């Protein structure tokens, strides 16, 4: 490995390697050869683009073997890097030796043609080798790093919250149950139903839908914290935007109100998008050309815009007065649909916008009740192209109000005793938000289906690979 040069280094520092002998290793993407010479496109995984290798029958002792190698065979190449400013590629490697590391079978599914995303989902173990998914998952990696960098540079503490939980943060009940009981013959409680006291944890336990409640504990000790981990929703939603397993970024900030919350959300979103654009120009150019023609313009617009702000009540009025006929009629009290959110950002504000102060009946129990008694200090960040990308709120710090809200929603206080206890010991104003990581990657890449931005998607009826 020591003497192998990564393809990324060759592209980023071409002049440093010009006219010098280099060694690369990678997989064959394309190969064409005549009796005298041939061309191989090699990708080593370190960079989106391939390297063209030129091999000559007069120099390569195993020329006949190499010229017949199937796509996806792995090879090592030793040769001289020659700059080619007048060609499509900035340089090529003129091979002196080619070593076959591993032969690929001739029935390799990813041949040199454009495959549909639907087909590629059926071979999720191989699709990272395709151009679109090579670009997608490299962007995913860089975006994840950018999120950590943003919060670390701001002094936030990275906090790991539990995957297994006995509480439902959203109060929606759409959770995956975790049990070691024999479900063919489970123990039955005296009052009927399954006796979870005999289960592994001694109570009903589920996969987490959010790390927020646990994150609040740490925010009230470390001031500013964030989580970044997998979450699970048992929603039977077979849509392009829903998955049963996905990743969430959830910062929590003490001594911070809703205004502070929106400021951090806006800064984070702009930072991550700009970071990916700077670090992955080849990938973004690919998406802009082949996936979403207006992508680059839209991303630049988000980065360079000052986000708008409007209350839910004002937004409803604007939509009603727009004269637009929506599939879902707009009236106060409804949860805004994607068509409403996109109309606000694309037609009315023509930029990203925060919608604040939603009706309490469509929001979670932990959101701070406003003085009007009807709305809560919640915010959703809407962006052109998709609508909601971030959801957050100022948290309810008043113990009596929080208890009353839980009673309204028939939530059992005993399940949240520790969360309620936070309000007894130095409670303060605090806020936070959640960003679905896959939703962000869809936005940055223009990919239209959440199944195509997760390495191995888990959706209704699908748990392959």
From Swiss-Prot:
CDD domains: AsxRS_core, EcAsnRS_like_N. Keywords: Aminoacyl-tRNA synthetase, ATP-binding, Cytoplasm, Ligase, Nucleotide-binding, Protein biosynthesis. The keyword Nucleotide-binding applies. It is found in: Cytoplasm. GO terms for biological process: asparaginyl-tRNA aminoacylation. It catalyses: tRNA(Asn) + L-asparagine + ATP = L-asparaginyl-tRNA(Asn) + AMP + diphosphate + H(+). GO terms for molecular function: asparagine-tRNA ligase activity; ATP binding; catalytic activity, acting on a protein; nucleic acid binding; transferase activity. Disulfide bonds: none annotated. The keyword Glycosyltransferase does not apply. Its EC number is 6.1.1.22. GO terms for cellular component: cytoplasm. HAMAP family: Asn_tRNA_synth (MF_00534). Belongs to the class-II aminoacyl-tRNA synthetase family. Homodimer. This is Asparagine--tRNA ligase. The gene is asnS.
């Amino acid at each position: 490995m020591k003497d192998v040069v990564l393809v990324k280094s060759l592209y980023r520092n071409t002049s440093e390697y010009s006219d010098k002998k280099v060694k690369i290793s990678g997989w064959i993407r394309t190969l064409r050869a005549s009796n005298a010479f041939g061309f191989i496109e090699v990708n080593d995984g370190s960079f989106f683009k391939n390297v063209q290798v030129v091999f000559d029958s007069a120099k390569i002792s195993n020329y006949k073997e190499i010229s017949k190698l199937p796509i996806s065979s792995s090879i090592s190449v030793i040769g001289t890097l020659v700059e080619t400013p007048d060609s499509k590629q900035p340089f090529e490697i003129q091979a002196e030796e080619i070593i076959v590391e591993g032969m690929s079978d001739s029935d390799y599914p990813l041949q040199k043609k454009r495959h549909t995303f639907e087909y590629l989902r059926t071979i999720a173990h191989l699709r990272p080798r395709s151009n679109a998914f090579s670009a997608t998952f490299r962007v995913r990696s860089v975006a994840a790093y950018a999120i950590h960098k943003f919060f670390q540079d701001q002094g936030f503490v990275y906090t790991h919250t539990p995957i297994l939980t006995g509480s439902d943060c959203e109060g929606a009940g759409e959770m995956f149950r975790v049990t070691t009981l024999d479900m063919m013959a489970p123990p039955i409680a005296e009052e009927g139903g399954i006796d979870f006291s005999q289960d592994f944890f001694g109570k009903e336990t589920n996969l987490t839908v959010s790390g927020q409640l646990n994150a609040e504990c740490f925010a009230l000790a470390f001031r500013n914290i964030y989580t970044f981990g997998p979450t699970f929703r048992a929603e039977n939603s077979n849509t392009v935007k829903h998955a049963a397993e996905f990743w969430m970024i959830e910062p929590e900030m003490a001594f911070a109100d809703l205004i502070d919350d929106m400021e951090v959300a806006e800064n984070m979103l702009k930072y991550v998008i700009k970071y990916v654009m700077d670090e992955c120009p080849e990938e973004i150019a690919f998406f802009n050309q082949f996936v979403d023609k207006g992508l680059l313009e839209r991303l630049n617009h988000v980065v360079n815009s000052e986000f708008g702000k409007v209350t839910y009540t004002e937004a409803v009025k604007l939509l009603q007065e727009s004269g637009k006929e929506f599939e879902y009629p707009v009236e106060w009290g409804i949860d805004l649909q994607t068509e409403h959110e996109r109309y606000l950002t694309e037609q009315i504000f023509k930029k990203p916008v925060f919608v604040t102060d939603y009706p309490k009946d469509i929001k979670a129990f932990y959101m701070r009740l406003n003085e009007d008694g009807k709305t809560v200090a919640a915010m959703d960040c809407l962006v052109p192209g998709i609508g909601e990308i971030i959801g957050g709120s100022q948290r309810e710090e008043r113990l009596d109000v929080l208890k009353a809200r839980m009673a309204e929603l028939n939530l059992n206080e005993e399940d949240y005793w520790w969360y309620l206890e936070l309000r007894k010991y130095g409670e303060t104003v605090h806020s936070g938000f959640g960003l679905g990581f896959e939703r962000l990657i869809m936005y940055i890449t223009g990919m239209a289906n959440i199944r195509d931005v997760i390495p191995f998607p888990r959706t209704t009826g699908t748990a392959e690979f």
